[in-house]
UniProtKB/Swiss-Prot annotation:
Gene3D superfamilies on file: 1.10.287.70, Potassium Channel Kv1.1, Chain A (3.30.710.10), Voltage-gated potassium channels. Chain C (1.20.120.350)
Extracellular-side segments: 206-230, 285-287, 346-359, 380-386
SMART domains cross-referenced by the UniProt entry: BTB (SM00225)
Key words of the record: Cell membrane, Glycoprotein, Ion channel, Ion transport, Membrane, Metal-binding, Phosphoprotein, Potassium, Potassium channel, Potassium transport, Transmembrane, Transmembrane helix, Transport, Voltage-gated channel, Zinc
Protein name, per record: A-type voltage-gated potassium channel KCND1
Intramembrane feature spans: 360-371, 372-379
Swiss-Prot/TrEMBL domain comment: The transmembrane segment S4 functions as a voltage-sensor and is characterized by a series of positively charged amino acids at every third position. Channel opening and closing is effected by a conformation change that affects the position and orientation of the voltage-sensor paddle formed by S3 and S4 within the membrane. A transmembrane electric field that is positive inside would push the positively charged S4 segment outwards, thereby opening the pore, while a field that is negative inside would pull the S4 segment inwards and close the pore. The zinc binding sites in the N-terminal domain are important for tetramerization and assembly of a functional channel complex. Most likely, the channel undergoes closed-state inactivation, where a subtle conformation change would render the protein less sensitive to activation.
Residue numbers spanned by region S4-S5 linker: 310-323
Subcellular localization, as worded in the UniProt entry: Cell membrane
Catalytic activity: K(+)(in) = K(+)(out)
Species this chain originates from: Bos taurus (Bovine)
Amino acid sequence: MAAGVATWLPFARAAAVGWLPLAQQPLPPAPGVKASRGDEVLVVNVSGRRFETWKNTLDRYPDTLLGSSEKEFFYNADSGEYFFDRDPDMFRHVLNFYRTGRLHCPRQECIQAFDEELAFYGLVPELVGDCCLEEYRDRKKENAERLAEDEEAEQAGDGPTLPAGSSLRQRLWRAFENPHTSTAALVFYYVTGFFIAVSVIANVVETIPCRSPTRRPPREQPCGDRFPLAFFCMDTACVLIFTGEYLLRLFAAPSRCRFLRSVMSLIDVVAILPYYIGLFMPKNEDVSGAFVTLRVFRVFRIFKFSRHSQGLRILGYTLKSCASELGFLLFSLTMAIIIFATVMFYAEKGTNKTNFTSIPAAFWYTIVTMTTLGYGDMVPSTIAGKIFGSICSLSGVLVIALPVPVIVSNFSRIYHQNQRADKRRAQQKVRLARIRLAKSGTTNAFLQYKQNGSLEDSGGGEEQALCVRNRSAFEQQHHHLLHCLEKTTCHEFTDELTFSEALGAVSLGSRTSRSTSVSSQPVGAGSLLSSCCPRRAKRRAIRLANSTASVSRGSMQELDTLAGLRRSPAPQSRSSLNAKPHDSLDLTCDSRDFVAAIISIPTPPANTPDESQPSSPGGGGGGASSTLRNSSLGTPCLLPETVKISSL
């Protein structure tokens, strides 16, 4: 009975649990996988690197390449991927933009390459996030300036070399813009610099008062009036040099209109124009005052030094790039001058014998105070005037000091940019020099190739052309290997006989073999054997009359390789496989000899029916023969007095 109760009691309890109300509301449905319609995982293969993302992620930006139907042109049906032959590191930032909606600019990547990737995927640079936007614009601006400078240098002919068919104008403009291209350009560069210095010094010295000892009483007068002929001759010589330079620059300029509108062209005109106006101006007292005014413009000749000084050019570029900051400084100073001049005028208005008679008269005091000069010709006397004068001085220091760091940073940036440009030009010159050296090396190799008999003359008469001699592939590999050995061992290897002469100096037979064997035996200095042995083909057997080595063990196949030995200048020796000095060879011998290296390989038992078995002159007639075959492929062995090549 107890056993029966124990059996059905758990089922009763389970049923009772089902009767009790466990929750007041119905239970939620069982969790399941919700099928997402229209969303799938897309695989994007960028140069072998696979990226996976949702289709809806890319569809958020339908105006781009990945978000539009244009990406279907890059779909590979075999792999089921979208393949793009682009930079995978850049694509990581592009894909993050689709995921997060923020585009970041990588610092370690080239800004131009980044722009190209954005243009390919249809993204505009304005999508760059605020965290990277300022740095992106600075880098892009710097890169644009560098490219503009390179383009100007290329148009001006400031490159390392000019084309062979360059015109006279191009050569002249290159000489003016880059004086270090030739000796004549460098001489003209220093001559013009000398005359610029003479002109500036003469313009200063002619105003120095000089005493005239001939007049009684002595009277001081300017040196220009005392020695008019000397100063006129110096001025004439300088102006002639400047005029010739200006006309030559105008003739050689790539764009004459652009040259006439340039700042340096205007400086040249202003430097030489007063001379010609004074030369043709009538000597009349009524117009002498205007001529004296025109002579003031001669001081602008000093700006011609900017062509001869890289620092002055950098300073000009800096001021040009800081135009907005300088405009802000000028506007701020103008406002402060007007405000403090008005305050100082009303503060000093009630005093007797004051110098602040009007607001424009107070401008001078405000300018001198804000620039911290303080001449002392105008001084406030009231307490209010002194207080406002102190405030004016402090505000001037703050206003002037604000744009200074920006100007300094721009100067430093342009300076380092010019340094990098000079370094790139120097590296480009080095690369071009290496290319010319390589070309000259190729020419020398061609001449050596011809000297070694690899080229022959074809045709007759005066017109003879060089053509490559028809050689077997085996012989071509032989010459190629010799060339490689010369480069690696710094020794020169030469053949005693050409390939055709070596074949004509021996008698050939017929023999077939499956494998290659090598044996070398000493022969006369005037004979050399070589042949080419392809696989499973009939091979020529060479029987030597003066063979000194014989094979006594079974039927052996031997391939003899002979190579010419010449005296090596290197004192040290190098060994190689397949290279072995013969016992009877005198290493101190200066004459050429041939060395034998024997590698024996058992002959296969099966022979072709047409195989001939020549008897060895030194053997015992056991079916073995000394077969000599010369393979032109060789490996050098440099002995103390000889150089030996033995081939596989």
